[in-house]
Each structure stands twice: as structure tokens, then as C-alpha cells.
A protein has these predicted regions:
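Gly/Pro-rich, tryptophan- and cysteine-flecked surface segments typical
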Residues: 1-258
């Protein structure tokens, strides 16, 4: 009987009930796959207000598995989850860099999310439980000032390393009710402006409240929110809902995860 209850408690419905009742909540889904997978964070790109974005990434498959001739794909989405660009990169170096400007995105001045996936036809050194996750560093420069870099913050999507074109989400788990409160460990006093970047890495609508204002973020949408208070608490129905922070002081820009 205990084994049956435990099994039911770990199903998708069981986890949803646990999270909604705040009974042994689960923040991340355990990925039970019989093939090696590539996981990507939901990275932010910005080309609005004089911004450009720089992305630094590694050839993970060669670095750790000595697999040659692998490649990566970048998938760029608008803030409303519209696919706007896919780019395949072959001939990887150990360390690589991509600059994302408005020109790169067909003169689009906005913001959104992008994902990076590692693919290979060579499976010699991989087993079916391997998970490739390139957390990477993303830099942001406004008006050609110095870049401020931050590493990956939110696990977003995953796919087979064999490039089968099926992309799955819901690594981060939600609940039915807004039961979860996260207070950012930062005092926002002394800055000219502060922005929080949110992305929804799930297939469910995330409902959240900041500074007594209610928001709804549809699946895989993203949103920039300017804040005014010195201490910020986020109440939501997502168990891991952590924004990227942009803090401005004169010409100084500080970007970091919360």
C-alpha cells in the first residue's frame, strides 16, 4: 500500500496536488528518459533601449565526452513566445561567443528568450541517462558600455541529443494556487532604476504578484517589470520563479540572478 501511495504521489497529478497543498512540494521534475538529453535554460536576449546581448558557451560534448563534430542550435523567441529565428552552428571551438544585436534579429528592438541545444550523431561515449546542460554566461551592454554577465538562471526546455525536433518543457513545476512567496535578497535603494526579467518555463500560466500588482504570464512568455520598492517579494504559483535583475546607477549596469 505504501509503495502504491508513493508511486501515485510522484505522478504528474500527484505532484500537482502536493504542490497545491504545500505538502512535500516538488520544484523540479525528475526526467525519466531512455536517451541522452540536452537541457537549455531560458536565456534572456535584449535589443531594446540601446541593448545588445553577448552569449558565451562551450562545446560541452567535446569538453567532457571527447565527442567530435557535434553542433548546437539556437532558438530565439519573442516575449510572446513566437519563434523568430533558428541558427545552427557547426565547427565549434572549446569556447564560443555569439553577439545578439537588433541587426542580428532583423532590426528587432525588443526582448525575449532563447535556448541552446547540443546535438551529435556520435553516441559512443554517452549513455541513456546522460543530461547535457550548458548553463553558459549571458552579457548585457547598453549604449556600448561594458557588458555585465550572468549565468543561466531558469531550466527551460529539453530535447534528445539526437536532434529529433521534439522539444519538451515543464522541468520547473507549478501549483494551482499562489502559495509560494520568494523575497529577493537585495535592497534596491540607491539605484536610478531596477527591472526584473521573468520568463515562464512551463506549459501552464504563471500567476504572480509584485508590489500589490497582479500579473499573468502565459506559457513560455517573458516580461520585464520595473519596480519601485526597496524590498521585493514575489507571490506566485510557481515553485522556482526567480527573475534576472537589472539595476541602473548613472552609467553603471549590474545584471545578476536573484
Amino acid at each position: 500500500m505504501k509503495l502504491l501511495v508513493k508511486k501515485l504521489a510522484n505522478t504528474d497529478i500527484g505532484i500537482l496536488l502536493r504542490n497545491s497543498l504545500n505538502f512535500k512540494p516538488v520544484s523540479f521534475k525528475y526526467l525519466k528518459k531512455d536517451y541522452p538529453i540536452s537541457i537549455s535554460d531560458a536565456f534572456l536576449w535584449r535589443t531594446d533601449n540601446g541593448y545588445k546581448t553577448k552569449f558565451k558557451y562551450s562545446d560541452i560534448l567535446y569538453l567532457f565526452y571527447k565527442i567530435k563534430n557535434s553542433w548546437v542550435e539556437f532558438h530565439f523567441y519573442s516575449k510572446n513566445n513566437k519563434l523568430i529565428k533558428v541558427e545552427k552552428v557547426n565547427d565549434l571551438n572549446l569556447s564560443n561567443e555569439l553577439e545578439i544585436s537588433s541587426e542580428y534579429l532583423n532590426n528587432l528592438e525588443d526582448y525575449g528568450t532563447f535556448y541552446i541545444y547540443h546535438f551529435s550523431k556520435n553516441t559512443k561515449n554517452l549513455n541513456n541517462k546522460d543530461i547535457i546542460s550548458n548553463r553558459c554566461y549571458t552579457g548585457y551592454s547598453q549604449n556600448n558600455n561594458l557588458y555585465s554577465f550572468v549565468h543561466g538562471n531558469t531550466l527551460g526546455k529539453f530535447t534528445s541529443i539526437f536532434s529529433n525536433k521534439t522539444f519538451l518543457t515543464d522541468i520547473v513545476i507549478t501549483s494551482v494556487f499562489k502559495k509560494y512567496t520568494y523575497t529577493i535578497q537585495k535592497c534596491f535603494d540607491g539605484y536610478d532604476k531596477n527591472e526584473l526579467f521573468f520568463t515562464n518555463p512551463t506549459s501552464k500560466t504563471i500567476k504572480f504578484t509584485i508590489e500589490s500588482k497582479n500579473y499573468e504570464l502565459k506559457p513560455n512568455y517573458s516580461l520585464l517589470v520595473e519596480i519601485k520598492n526597496s524590498i521585493i517579494s514575489i507571490n506566485s504559483n510557481c515553485l522556482f520563479f526567480r527573475p534576472i535583475i537589472f539595476s541602473y546607477h548613472k552609467k553603471y549596469l549590474d545584471v545578476h540572478h536573484s
